[in-house]
């Protein structure tokens, strides 16, 4: 499973708690209420543990977490 699909699956299964939910890679996760502050922390922990990528605190900003595509683009140069 590629990084984008893995992140989307994690969001659907662990944050939305609905593996059958529709989640487009460009959906605004924050405006839609899918990600809140606690969910972002959970997602960062997943990225660090499952993908082995350290996410600096100063990089946890709206532009990097607004969608699955934005997050994958942010993560690309990190590993």
Model-derived regions: residue spans:
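Thiotemplate assembly-line natural product biosynthesis machinery
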Residues: 1-21, 73-78
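Catalytic nucleophile serine of serine hydrolases
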Residues: 37
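C-terminal structural segments of small proteins and small subunits
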Residues: 60-77
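Conserved catalytic core of two-component sensor histidine kinases
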Residues: 41
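Phosphopantetheine carrier-protein modules
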Residues: 15-34, 52-61
